[in-house]
Amino acid sequence: MNGIMSFKWKILFLGYCGVILYVSSLSPKGLPGGPALVSDKILHLCEYGLFGILAWGAFGVRKGVFPWGLVVLGAWFGIMDECWQDWIGKSRSADVWDAAADAVGSLLGVTVAQLFWIKR
């Protein structure tokens, strides 16, 4: 991947991190309402699956070497996101199971990217 393309992936990744933190800053009233058709753990899994894919696009290593550091980055960011929610208040609190779903989502996203994306 050339330098310009890698830079674009890094900008996209950092922007997505900002979106995650922004949504985490919203009060429950600011979040989409309606009946919960899907478990919030599934939403966390998907959210951090995309995080893992974007992280791989931005920082992935050559094919054949599994980037465990990106999985750890996703797990760490998920934990920090939960701490952020707890710290800002707004009727939101940290949930260890949300952080676990974030870590698993990150692992799945990085794995999917590693398996299906050709990077030189």
Which residues are covered by each model-predicted region?
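Alpha-helical transmembrane segments of multipass membrane proteins
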Residues: 18-22, 79, 83, 107
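Membrane-interfacial alpha-helical segments at the cytosolic side of multi-pass membrane proteins
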Residues: 47-61, 92, 106-117
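"…centered on the first transmembrane helix and the immediately adjacent amphipathic helix/loop
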Residues: 1-57, 70, 74
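Small-residue faces within membrane-embedded alpha-helices
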Residues: 52, 70-74, 78, 102, ...
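Membrane-embedded catalytic cores of phosphoryl/pyrophosphoryl-handling enzymes
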Residues: 59-81, 85
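Short, charged juxtamembrane terminal tails flanking transmembrane helices
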Residues: 2, 118-120
